[in-house]
Amino acid sequence: LYACVAVSDPLLDILQRYWGYAQFRPGQREAMDAVVQGRDSLLVLPTGGGKSLCFQAPALIRPGVALVISPLISLMKDQVDTLTANGVPAAYLNSAMAPEDRRQVMQGLRERRYRLLYVAPERIAGEGSTILPWLHETCGLSFVAVDEAHCISHWGHDFRPEYRQIGALRQGLPGVSLHAFTATATARVRDDIVAQLGLQDPVTLVGSFDRANLLYRVLPRQTMRAQVRQVLARHRGEAGIIYCPTRREVDTLAASLAEEGYRVRPYHAGLTDEERHANQDAFLNESVDIVVATVAFGMGIDRSDVRFVIHAGAPQSLEHYQQEAGRAGRDGLEAECVLIVSSGDFLRWRDILSKNGDLTEARQGLLRDMERYAASVGCRHRRLVSYFGEAYSKPDCGACDYCLGELESVPDPATLARKILSAVARVGQRYGAAHVGQVLRGQLSEAVRSRGHDTLSVFGLLRDVSVDDLRGYTDQLLAFGLLRQVGDPYPVLQLTDAGAAGLRDAAALDSLSLARQRKPEKGSGPKKSRVEAESWVGVDRDLFDQLRAMRQRLARERGVPPYVIFHDTTLRELARLKPTSMSALRDVYGVGARKADDLGPEVLRVLHGG
């Protein structure tokens, strides 16, 4: 996983001194070299891959100040807080700052005190476009880094028009290199980023999109609250994020979980700035375990020990899903990502995008890809990385519902599909999934009897199939484009051309796969991923808990989030290796010389009871 480099390397020396890392992660060395050498570059590294380090470390080597363009105030604040705690001189400028704070930063720039300056894209567009020449003249721009660079692409999942102006601004900055960084971008988006920013002969580096430590599960929606609680029961006392589609759903679920004793806070745009900041800080400071949020939360949250992410509804693209689910397990340790989904999620997205005038062909394509992922029968890791154009060579990931044997393939999917398609046709393509399900299961409801649907040849054809399984199969046929839903607010099922062809000729459905959730054996819970089974080997759990308590106390005393002290990965290594000297402590992953000098005596006291 890590590439060893000679100790004399100045980049490695900086990595060790300020961050406590003795090795580069895949892709980091090449990305940092491009920045140090002043060559334009594009780096795509998944969340948790160490993307930010690729511009932070070179800023300490090149003379002048590095400008980092970052889309979220919370993201820049988190990164600057962490850098400052590590001894790296950094600052940010944004519209939410008090005038006095802004004046202090400007004075610090004049005095050349900083090596990194974070700004929002709005700060360098329009009237703010003079800041770049001023910075270059005042303290010398070492380079410009564009974080979350997918925002510049019309094909990206988070298009921000103001990002388009960045490329034009560099024309007045000869000799200043430009670098684009993102965690998620398809080949089409990567090409668009290069074109829009005007990158010149860029070094392009694309890391692996596979997050092997994440366990992916997809659950057809049944009883949402009960399904969420089942996941939470596996993660008592652990950090997690639950994404809901609407503010109302966020508030309702957060209140319900709080009543049940969970340490939980809501987060969405309907809260005041003060409430949002307080709730975010409570999560970062570990005074709450769970945040229930709309998707705005978490883009730059640097709490690396998130052990689960639940999507209580499908996001609008696989790019969104990969980035949001990627909030989990950023420390490289095991984490669970659960998508609870129904066909109604995609109807709702189409309605929202249509009302906003955003239902473009590109957006519809992204939505269809998300729908197919949710309905797919096969390895989730393979499906995700292949979407981003990466080959997946492992025969079995050992970290998804399919590879862990939690899904059961239907032995004759074409026959099952044709029964459902036939029922949709027989009721005249004028009824919804619930009514079609009643007909197929032979339920004599008033609606079925009054319409004479109990006399149809398809009545009772799937009497032995449960309501939940039948709805799951129907959703899969929708995702595979054999059925569509039409009408609002009560959508009806209709055959597509492909569905009609499959009804006429079973051979048209030869490649179809359908699956259902396998019922767990009595008394057995969900299986653990291989990563989880391996990550605790040799770790003294009691000692790990003592180290976490030490971290919490030190964080409170110093007024910083616990992750600034140490990440969980480092605590596990300490509880596994149990170093006995300051020299051995410096060599532990994530400690380094600076933190060993600062925190070493305290750590050794906990490890050995001194």
Regions found by a protein language model. Give the residues of each.
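Accessory DNA-binding and partner-docking regions appended to nucleic-acid-acting proteins
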Residues: 2-14, 363-364, 393-610
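Helicase motor core with emphasis on the C-terminal RecA-like subdomain
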Residues: 2-18, 22, 26, 30-42, ...
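Gly/serine-rich nucleotide phosphate-binding loop at the start of the catalytic core
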Residues: 67
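Flexible coil/turn residues that form the inter-helical turn or adjacent wing/linker of helix-turn-helix
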Residues: 174, 236, 377, 429, ...
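Short, charged low-complexity linear segments at domain edges
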Residues: 360-391
